[in-house]
């Protein structure tokens, strides 16, 4: 099934963009993290703290495999770390058209300021951690991207229009 798959760093706008694309395209919206947290009845942070990152990543892979079987086309927002897991490469490529929301370091720092949602930002200096993770993840996101757009530089409506135009052109080919 050719779902519209949204990937990107924490704070890149995956959920907001996904919801708007879903509305505009008339497709259901799925947030992979929300599926996991609902099934576990815990926040992502609580799952990380109680069971560890490997357990959370295994849950992501399980849900990803299930989404591939879904015959109804959807807009799907993935967790920021999912594309980094080697075992997910095959599934991610099968899932559909991948849209990478690329945020600048400044944009992401600003959006993540004060956020305690993501346990990946715990520990060392937050700005350094964001910079380090972004440097590690950006090449992986780019590898999977069928479409790439930059967030935080244009008004939201223009960003959505750009994605929809690129999506339409990509899917015609």
Q: What is the predicted role of each segment?
A:
Residues 6:
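Hydrophobic anchor at the beta1->P-loop junction of P-loop NTPases
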Residues 9:
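P-loop (Walker A) phosphate-binding loop of NTP-binding proteins
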Residues 15:
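Walker A/P-loop
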Residues 20, 24, 135-173:
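NTP-dependent small-molecule kinase module
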Residues 23-34:
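Post-Walker A helix-loop "phosphate-sensing" segment adjacent to the P-loop in P-loop NTPases
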Residues 34-91, 118-119:
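ATP-dependent small-molecule kinase phosphotransfer cores
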Residues 80-82, 104-106, 154:
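Short glycine-rich anion-binding loops that position phosphate/pyrophosphate groups of nucleotides
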Residues 95-138:
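A glycine- and Lys/Arg-enriched "phosphate-lid" helix/loop adjacent to the NTP-binding pocket
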């Amino acid at each position: 099934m050719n779902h519209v798959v949204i990937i990107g760093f924490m704070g890149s706008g995956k959920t907001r963009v996904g919801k708007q694309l879903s509305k505009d395209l008339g497709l259901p919206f799925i947030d992979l993290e929300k599926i996991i947290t609902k099934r576990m009845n815990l926040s992502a942070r609580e799952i990380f703290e109680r069971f560890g990152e490997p357990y959370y990543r295994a849950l992501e892979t399980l849900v990803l495999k299930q989404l591939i079987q879904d015959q109804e086309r959807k807009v799907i927002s993935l967790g920021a770390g999912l594309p980094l897991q080697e075992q997910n490469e095959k599934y991610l490529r099968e899932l559909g058209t991948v849209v990478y929301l690329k945020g600048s370091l400044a944009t992401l720092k600003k959006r993540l300021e004060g956020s305690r949602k993501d346990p990946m930002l715990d520990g060392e200096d937050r700005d350094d951690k964001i910079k380090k993770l972004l440097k590690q993840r950006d090449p992986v996101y780019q590898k999977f991207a069928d479409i790439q757009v930059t967030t935080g530089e244009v008004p939201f409506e223009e960003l959505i229009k750009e994605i929809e135009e690129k999506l339409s052109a990509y899917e015609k080919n």
